Amino acid sequence: MSGHGHGHGHGHGCCECEHEPAERGVEYELYRRIDIEKLQCLNESRDGDGKLVFKPWDQRTDRNKFVESDADEELLFNIPFTGSVKLKGIIISGEDDESHPAEIRLFKNIPQMSFDDTSREPEQAFRLNRDPRAELEYPTKIARFSNVEHLSIHVSRNFGAESTRVYYIGLRGEYTEAHRHEVTICNYEAAANPADHKVESITPQTQFIS
């Protein structure tokens, strides 16, 4: 199915090639709004590696920075933001093999979440496709992901390997920073042509669980 999805819709004409990377790079700037020093990744094989996968769009395929799970295939990212976020979409990219995440479960506003807490019902869950080039976005149910100050991403399983490897996690949405006398809203979405939105090729590959 992945071959079918990549073969259609998103043409490789020079016009799209010139404009799309800049637009999508603007959309995925929410990583700048993460309180990175307080970000936690549970079950990472090396301390601090979980922070490395929240990086600029143009580094999304960089294979030098990644996180790998330790004791088993699960990972749990606890992501505090410096303000309030309305999350609209997520990209998660790994290796093109069995170590790629196969399912993620999203929780909001549960600081210091542990694996024991993952037994509760998530706000949303996705079955993933292998996406080594970070091309597939999974759209969130926006009504559930407004006013997010803390996001937890539970990688519950992969495609069969003993450990899971993640290279990039991209977050798209709006950020609201509260000041004493005003509120600044940063909308990380380019004014893109709907025809550029890969709807035809992405939709068949995005499976909602809940």
Curated annotation (Swiss-Prot):
Metal-binding as UniProt keyword: no
Top-level division of the source organism's lineage: Eukaryota
Compartment(s) of residence: Cytoplasm
GO biological process: positive regulation of DNA-templated transcription; positive regulation of megakaryocyte differentiation
Stored InterPro entries: Galactose-bd-like_sf, PITH1-like, PITH_dom, PITH_dom_sf
Subcellular location, principal: cytoplasm
One Gene Ontology cellular component annotation held by this UniProt entry: cytoplasm
Domain PITH: 19-191
Keywords: Activator, Cytoplasm, Transcription, Transcription regulation
A Pfam family: PITH
Coiled-coil residue windows: none
The family this protein is said to belong to: Belongs to the PITHD1 family.
Function recorded in the entry: May play a role in promoting megakaryocyte differentiation by up-regulating RUNX1 expression.
Cited PANTHER family: AD039 HT014 THIOREDOXIN FAMILY TRP26, PITH DOMAIN-CONTAINING PROTEIN 1
Protein name: PITH domain-containing protein 1
Record organism: Danio rerio
Designated gene of the protein: pithd1
